[in-house]
Amino acid sequence: FEEFVKSRFNSEGKLMSEMLTHTLSSRGKGLRPMVVMLTSALTSAANNRTWVAGERNCSMRTYLAAMLVEMLHTASLVHDDVIDQADTRRGRPSANALWQSRNAVVLGDYILARTMASGMESAQYDLVSHIIGSVATICEGEVLQSQHSRDMDTTRQDYLEIIYKKTASLISVSASAGAVSVIAPRGDVEQMRRFGEALGMAFQIQDDILDTRSLVGSVRCV
């Protein structure tokens, strides 16, 4: 899968190539592509499988879906670091810390553009259409979070809407895209979507709790 991604994200420009290499090597554990591959295996029919690189239960369409969601996520993180003025990402310098925010914004846009281009070049329009709408949802979540960042009146419903749009929506799409990639029945696609949404909400709530505990633990009385 890593080679599949790298083969589609390269640049002849020296600076863009450096930024891409750094960003792609700073990616996390790949939760979203793992969800795509898991749900494709759960919903695929035995006679509807074309193996890629010897990997069981993984068709070229599934690889494409996994790549699309992972790189949309990667682009969103690059932009997140610019918005948050974050100097690090997973223990390494962020793109904006190394190459300034203006270049990092362009990098995020470049990754997003190459992701969409890869999807269209594949001619798998049902997959692209299924996944690409999540970009707008993520953007809405980012604006909502910014709107409520210093709002002491933020409600539980506000919080749930923010984490759904920023995090759970793409994990939900990842889960349903796995089913779409193997041409699963609509009922299976919907079940996987609901599973992904629940997983994404739980994932972000747990992450926020851990962040809060970390902040509380760092407070010292003087």
Task: Please identify what each model-predicted range represents.
Residues 217-222:
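Conserved small/polar residues in nucleotide/adenosyl-binding loops
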Residues 6, 10-215:
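Mg2+-dependent prenyl diphosphate-binding active-site environment of isoprenoid biosynthetic enzymes
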